[in-house]
Amino acid sequence: MELKVIDKKDDFLVCEVENDATLGSRKSVNVPGVRINLPSLTEKDRKNILWAIENDLDFIAHSFVRNKQDVMDIQRILDEHNSPIKIIAKIENQEGVDNIDEILEVAYGIMLSLIHI
């Protein structure tokens, strides 16, 4: 689905749909070239990390990593629980690409999503 912004308000955008598509629930939104100022982790993410710790997973792949802090937010939770889980940073936007060197300093590995970049 592709949208064209036709008006911008303080807390929402008015968009025109450019093609035929159906938007389902629980879908992410990719806005190329725009920095999205949202927290790296949701409450659901935190619960999923705790589940991963309890179930001795080896890796966590964190989507839409933008910077080093996004990885460190997960690492802090893992450290609080003395977990050896490794973090794979999924780079899916330009901000992540721009900060890839600092992300590599703290992540075990990276995955690049060529569809989103």
Regions found by a protein language model. Give the residues of each.
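Catalytic cores of alpha/beta
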Residues: E95-E105
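Active-site beta-loop-alpha junctions enriched in small/polar residues
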Residues: E18-D20, V65, K90-Q94
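Conserved small/polar residues in nucleotide/adenosyl-binding loops
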Residues: I115-I117
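Active-site-adjacent beta->alpha loops and helix N-cap segments on the catalytic face
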Residues: F64-E80, G96-D98
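Conserved, mostly hydrophobic/aromatic
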Residues: A52, I60, I103, S113
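Short beta-strand/loop segments at the ligand-binding rim of alpha/beta enzyme cores
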Residues: V31-I36, L78-K90
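Hydrophobic faces of well-ordered beta-strands that scaffold small-molecule active sites
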Residues: I60, I87-I91, I110-L112
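Beta-strand/loop-dominated core regions that host nucleotide or nucleotide-derived cofactor-binding catalytic loops
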Residues: M1-I49
